[in-house]
Curated annotation (Swiss-Prot):
Stored Pfam families: Cytidylate_kin (PF02224)
Main enzyme class: transferase
Catalysed reactions, as listed in the record: CMP + ATP = CDP + ADP; dCMP + ATP = dCDP + ADP
NCBIfam families, sorted: cmk
Listed name of the protein: Cytidylate kinase
Record-level Gene Ontology MF annotations: ATP binding; CMP kinase activity; dCMP kinase activity
Gene name, Swiss-Prot/TrEMBL: cmk
GO biological process, any: nucleobase-containing small molecule interconversion
Length: 226
């Protein structure tokens, strides 16, 4: 049976990662968290106090401490920078609020996209992000673009933060998500937009199971036809 490439794009907190992880597990595919890669680069920038003018130093740190993914005993995915487990650190609010400017740096995107394409070559992979279907995997057999209202996405982020013990204010989250949407869709390099051949799916009011079922059925149909 042919293993395909699945690209899931969408704005912040549209459910991309949650859905992608479940589908990868169900299909026996590899899940590549591209957002975690950009968050890791952002974590490096913030930890060392680097600005957008010091891209070479961020890349140097990435080379010294490469991004890798490992599985925890419970099956969840851990993110490492070199030997440092940054799984929780890269989800903190300061990283979330700065990832847009770091991910907009052309040199950072070029390096991480190169890594992502190399990993995806063999197929049997599902990636989520903001430019997977348009830039990273334009040849993906299935492209999905998830959308949801700012209100619903802020509520999801608020619940996620509660579960992780991160303090947050709902109204502030709404403002931050709206600002992130604007930054991501207006950046010069790889702006957030759906691929022309992507299936657009509004997840507002739709359960995770409902979104998973929709995408998985599309994937299985493509596999059956190939």
């Amino acid at each position: 049976m042919k293993a395909i490439k699945i690209a899931i794009d969408g704005p912040a907190s549209s459910g991309k990662s949650t859905v992608a992880k479940i589908i990868a597990k169900n299909l026996g595919y590899t899940y590549l968290d591209t957002g975690a890669m950009y968050r890791s680069a952002t974590y490096i920038a913030l930890t060392h106090g680097y600005t957008g003018k010091e891209v070479a130093l961020i890349l140097e740190e990435l080379e010294k401490n490469p991004i890798s993914f490992k599985k925890a005993k419970d099956g969840s995915q851990l993110v490492f920078l070199g030997d440092e487990d940054v799984t929780l650190a890269i989800r903190q609010n300061d990283v979330t609020n700065n990832v847009s400017w770091v991910s907009a740096l052309p040199e950072i995107r070029e390096e991480l996209v190169h890594q992502q394409r190399r990993i995806a070559q063999a197929g049997g992979i599902i990636m989520d992000g903001r430019d997977i279907g348009t830039v990273v995997l334009p040849d993906a057999e299935l492209k999905i673009f998830l959308v949801a209202s700012v209100e619903e996405r802020a509520e999801r982020r608020y619940k996620e933060n509660l579960e992780k013990g991160i303090e947050s204010d709902f109204e502030t989250l709404k403002e931050e998500i709206a600002a992130r949407d604007y930054k991501d869709s207006h950046r010069k390099v790889s702006p957030l937009k759906s691929a022309e051949d992507a299936l657009i799916f509004d997840t507002t009011g739709v359960s995770i199971d409902g979104v998973v079922q929709f995408i998985q059925e599309k994937a299985e149909k493509i596999v059956d036809m190939s």
